[in-house]
Amino acid sequence: MHSKTNKKVKEGQKNRIRTLVVDDSPLMCRVVSEILDEDGGFEVAGQALNGKEALKMLASQEFDLCTLDVHMPGMNGLTVLKHIMIRYPTPTLMVSAFTADGSKITFDALRYGAVDFFHKPSRDNGKSMSEQGDLLCKKAKDVARVQLDAAQYLRLKTSCNTSCKKKKNRTTDSIVIMHGGTGSYASMLNLLPTMGKTPLSPVIVSMAVDQEHLDAFVKYLRSYVPFNIFSASALQEIKPGSVYFISKEQAGTFDYKKGQLVLETAPRADLNEKEGGIDLLLFSAAEHFGEKALALFLSGENCQGISGAKEVLRSKGTVLAQKPETCLRPDLSRAVLHQKKAGAATLPELATKAACWS
């Protein structure tokens, strides 16, 4: 996979994002194209009804973004994606029905180089078409801005859960918190399986994704890690050696109930544009764990979490960020590294640190 720079996107959106829409349904091609056209920030420069048409168009002209149907007859979406990443590297947004059966294929696509995915627009999913259109355009713009040379094919092996049983009433005085936004699916798919062993401390993962997608991602990840992972409940008992995920819809704080460490989650309320649920989680971690708090920042597009990172550092905890050049979206990592005493590390280095932190 070679580097490719999207100059049109980097020039402050002076030019519209040249987009290729790929879907075997002419109706869905038209719906997606109309949504992008109406936004004004996109130029739908091509439509393809199958993989061969898509690859032919990519060979003849340059696109800033490709939206790609997961399920297509003949050459399916995953096969097309592999060809795109090898022959015509282009930021790709998978467009999926995201059914129970389809979620695995969708997450497989993220391993093969897709940046993110989006539900196919529908009048039956509980959101207005206008709201779905706005969300699609925002996600498409985020995908078009990625550092494509940071994308990679992830070869994952299935793993048996070998988590050892913990002693009853064991408490913990250390914590690991991970946070990421756009591009963090790929970071997590790389980092957590690389840990290879049960972490010594509890690990809390905050991802800027919807709860529905987070639950499906946790289920998908279970096949590739040798330890317990969960979607955190409203009052989650926290144990060493397990990983707990919270979504962008949640804010978490730590407390002790009858001597047991718990994570209390509630609907997220942003403090302001630059502070959100991750900051509240980090404030709480700094208060309860002090120098035994480890905060890891991964790929992401916004700077929420910086205030929390400062508090962890002030409490003598440790803050590390994924090296910006390895992030699909380096904005968050770069912002963290502007803080004194925050360090940069590769994903394998972060995996080792997280596994051994105590």
Predicted regions and their residues:
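Conserved acid/base catalytic micro-environments in cytosolic active-site loops
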Residues: 2-20, 26-37, 52-53, 63, ...
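Conserved Asp/Asn-Gly motif in the active-site loop of CheY-like receiver
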Residues: 45-52
